[in-house]
């Protein structure tokens, strides 16, 4: 979505490291108990010289107990040049993105050779994306980057409205470029089908990327061949070949380890929930 490309480059209030020449931008590392960024502010590295030989954007590394991005705030490493976007590494207990918050490592240009989109790695007990919030590593005219969400306790995806979710897309400005790869390991993944919050590794002319998910439970989101008004996991290409989706659900018996209760004259009614399917592939 071009809106998010613009947003990634517009985070000019906050902590910024940028290059306008042929040298690389510096890296940013933050170590703190709680980091809260709101109302359009951001932590940003960028390469903004419109030249194929421009320098690279810097990397961003954040270590925090709590990370909150609210109200079009974000963490962004972006290139508007032939330089590469930097990588983003987040290690936190709780990560919350709401009201358009973004974590993005994008390449936004049509120069040759193309600058590369960066990779995003997030390690957290809980990750929440709510109300059009987004984790993305996308290229306008090259390959999308890779996203790693590892050792996540709960991944909660809400109210995406077709914009929010987890995305690695290639060639989104109608250029050649393949989708990147998304790797997720989580205990629990929750979404609401009607809220259109997606996990997507797409492309326009190139090949769709790869999505590899291992979880104990997945609720409210499932594989589909392309983007729909519902919440989905997809690796489609508009004009090229689709990519690969591999979802492994290690569902456990929720009654395992429970002791039987003594019979009573009146038992409460028990409604058993549905357990997600074992595998979904495309």
Regions of interest found by a model, annotated:
Residues 1-282:
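Extracellular and secretory-pathway beta-repeat/beta-biased strand scaffolds
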């Amino acid at each position: 979505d071009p809106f998010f490309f613009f947003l990634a480059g517009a985070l000019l209030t906050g902590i910024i490291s940028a290059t306008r020449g042929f040298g690389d931008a510096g890296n940013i590392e933050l170590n703190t108990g709680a980091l809260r960024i709101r109302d359009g502010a951001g932590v940003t590295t960028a390469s903004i010289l419109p030249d194929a030989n421009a320098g690279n954007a810097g990397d961003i590394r954040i270590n925090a107990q709590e990370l909150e991005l609210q109200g079009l705030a974000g963490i962004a490493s972006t290139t508007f040049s032939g330089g590469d976007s930097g990588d983003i590494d987040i290690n936190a207990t709780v990560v919350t993105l709401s009201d358009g918050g973004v974590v993005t490592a994008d390449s936004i240009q049509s120069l040759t050779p193309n600058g590369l989109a960066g990779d995003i790695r997030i390690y957290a007990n809980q990750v929440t994306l709510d109300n059009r919030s987004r984790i993305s590593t996308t290229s306008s005219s090259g390959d999308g980057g890779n996203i790693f969400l590892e050792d996540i306790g709960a991944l909660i995806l809400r109210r995406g409205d077709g914009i929010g979710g987890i995305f690695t897309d290639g060639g989104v400005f109608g250029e050649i470029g393949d989708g990147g790869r998304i790797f997720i390991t989580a205990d629990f993944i929750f979404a609401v089908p009607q809220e259109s919050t997606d996990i997507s590794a797409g492309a326009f002319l190139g090949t769709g990327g790869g999505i590899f998910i291992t979880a104990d439970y997945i609720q409210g989101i499932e594989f589909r061949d392309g983007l729909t008004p519902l919440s989905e996991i997809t690796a489609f290409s508009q004009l090229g070949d689709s990519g690969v989706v591999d979802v492994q659900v290690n569902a456990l018996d929720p009654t395992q380890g429970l002791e039987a209760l003594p019979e009573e004259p009146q038992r409460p009614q028990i409604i058993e929930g549905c357990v997600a399917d074992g595998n979904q592939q495309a």
